[in-house]
């Protein structure tokens, strides 16, 4: 039985974004291995019950300590050598680097999954500039592997990395995000409320844009355009970009947000909303919350950045706003809040766009074809 090994930083990220594709690969006859940093036993047990073989990498998601990196690299190489995968599929920067070096050394087929380029390519600090330089230098070495394929979620990231590295366009592919299953995320008509509901559901990082939404809330309420800002999300305690929980609770006490905490049933939150907002400046792929909202038929508003830009067609399926332009964000959100007919029309078109371009069945089919080609030809 041929082996596919997924190497990814976060166990929760694999469970949220990659399980459907991994299950499809398993159903196609592959033995599935998952190498990740498993925090506790909960997710690892769930994945094992699905028939995946799980391995703990102990790779810290947030640490930029080079000693820790090389210590983890030794363990990961030993683990990957033991697994001996026919295809290694790495997701996010650290796995791409560690797995990339491994595949180059052992001449293995590898897919490097760029689900956004990460904060290394966002922050202009001395430490990040050094890490970015080393990362790009490492990428150039890794990309020389003829069995290496670079998989992106949107064209913006592909164009940027091609401009920054010696990679060839012929060794790249764009697959439209993680996809979403429209048979699970059903279309529904929104409830037209006297006080509309805007949903923000994401990790609680400043770069995800909640602070900008709170500022917009203040401005619109002052104008007499009130709305409920529902906030659901994951608090990342050790992340320097994290919004302190004390700040979240303060906004809640002030009536600026309705803090819901971490919610497992995001689908119900989307159904209960009129608009879904994600004014993110984070370098990411296509945000899942926007895929889910579009499938349910909700108008979305987001900053005009790579992943959001590839999903939302401005003023047709939703609203795009110049990054960090809070004035325009306020204007466009007000337009959505005061135009129920416009929202519904956008929602219908969003659903159609999901079915034709972003359905998970399409993403799964494209991904399985990459595995088949790699195993049949030893290259892409």
Set out the residue ranges of the language-model regions:
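Nucleotide-activated donor-binding/catalytic signature segment of Leloir-type glycosyltransferases, i.e.
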Residues: 242-263
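Acidic anion/phosphate-binding donor-loop and adjacent secondary structure
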Residues: 64-67, 162-163, 176-195, 273, ...
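A short, active-site helix/loop in glycosyltransferases that binds the activated sugar's phosphate group
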Residues: 144-172, 179-182, 367
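Conserved acidic donor-binding segment of nucleotide-sugar-dependent glycosyltransferases
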Residues: 314-315, 319-326, 335-340
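Short hydrophobic beta-strand element within catalytic cores of glycosyltransferases
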Residues: 290, 299-302, 312
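Conserved donor-binding/catalytic core segment of Leloir-type glycosyltransferases
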Residues: 5, 190-208, 214-217, 229-230
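Membrane-proximal helix-turn-helix segments that form the acceptor-binding/catalytic region
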Residues: 23-25, 74-77, 105, 130-150
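A short, well-ordered alpha-helix in the C-terminal region of glycosyltransferases
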Residues: 328, 335, 342-357, 363-369
